[in-house]
Amino acid sequence: METESTGTPTGETRLALVRRARRIDRILAETYPYAVAELDFETPFELLVATVLSAQTTDVRVNAATPALFARFPDAHAMAAATEPELQELVRSTGFYRNKASAILRLSQELVGRHDGEVPARLEDLVALPGVGRKTAFVVLGNAFGQPGITVDTHFGRLARRLGFTDETDPGKGRARRGRPVPPARDWTMLSHRLIFHGRRVCHARRPACGRCPIARWCPSYAAGETDPERARALLAYELKPGREELLELLRAGRTAGAAGPRPRAGGXAPGLPAQPFR
């Protein structure tokens, strides 16, 4: 619980929390240099639609469905003229396809009617769109426009609590907590990617692989899961999504996501987005 004297959930001083968070981010950046947006996209519109489709499913399933979807309806103008049955068939594999087809149709129509078919680059405009909440808006702002934003999904929220960055269980309240965020705003997007990636691979909800965690030394929740290194190894569940191996090789060679250049349906980092951990 956050205290009046320290202002942090762990009871450590604010300065100690900031230093620990910086160390954690540096280690995660070194461990996962390829942690970027997992949804494939080429335009802000594609990312917006893909993020809406990602609800209650995996990014892998969305990435399998979107090439055909965007080949037929490449922008808001084209999708706004689609019928719901057409969209339902194309997004069926993502689950809840009737609701999702309706959502992306209304979203496209609103973009055409209010923004001339362009995705707005302001938070207040994004959240005013049908089916777009703050999480989706921050994904788009951070990855399509290079504007800082923390993507609070289930992985990020779980890790933020385990690491003692917050004690809130409600993501909406977590944004409004007293005091300034631990990382500076410019680093929010990349920190989100790293924590989400770490949550998928190591820090699982039910049984985290503590014995294989690169930040175990700085985690106040160490021993919440399996601490034996060999047994923890068997729990590691995530490495790279299919098709990202070439990016890993480039990054290991010292090149950034931007240096890799565009590739078909690539998410990657937005132009100008910092690839280094905050300091």
Swiss-Prot record:
Organism: Micrococcus luteus (strain ATCC 4698 / DSM 20030 / JCM 1464 / CCM 169 / CCUG 5858 / IAM 1056 / NBRC 3333 / NCIMB 9278 / NCTC 2665 / VKM Ac-2230) (Micrococcus lysodeikticus)
Family: Belongs to the Nth/MutY family.
Protein name, UniProt field: Ultraviolet N-glycosylase/AP lyase
Ranges for region Disordered: 256-279
GO MF, one example: DNA binding
Cofactor: [4Fe-4S] cluster
Pfam families: EndIII_4Fe-2S (PF10576), HHH (PF00633), HhH-GPD (PF00730)
Record's keyword terms, sorted: 4Fe-4S, DNA damage, DNA repair, Endonuclease, Glycosidase, Hydrolase, Iron, Iron-sulfur, Metal-binding, Nuclease, RNA suppression of termination
Additional information: Readthrough of the terminator UAG occurs between codons for Gly-268 and Ala-270. Two forms of 31 kDa and 32 kDa have been detected.
Gene3D superfamilies: Helix-hairpin-Helix base-excision DNA repair enzymes (C-terminal), Hypothetical protein, domain 2
Residues annotated for [4Fe-4S] cluster binding in this entry: C203, C210, C213, C219
HAMAP family according to UniProt: Nth
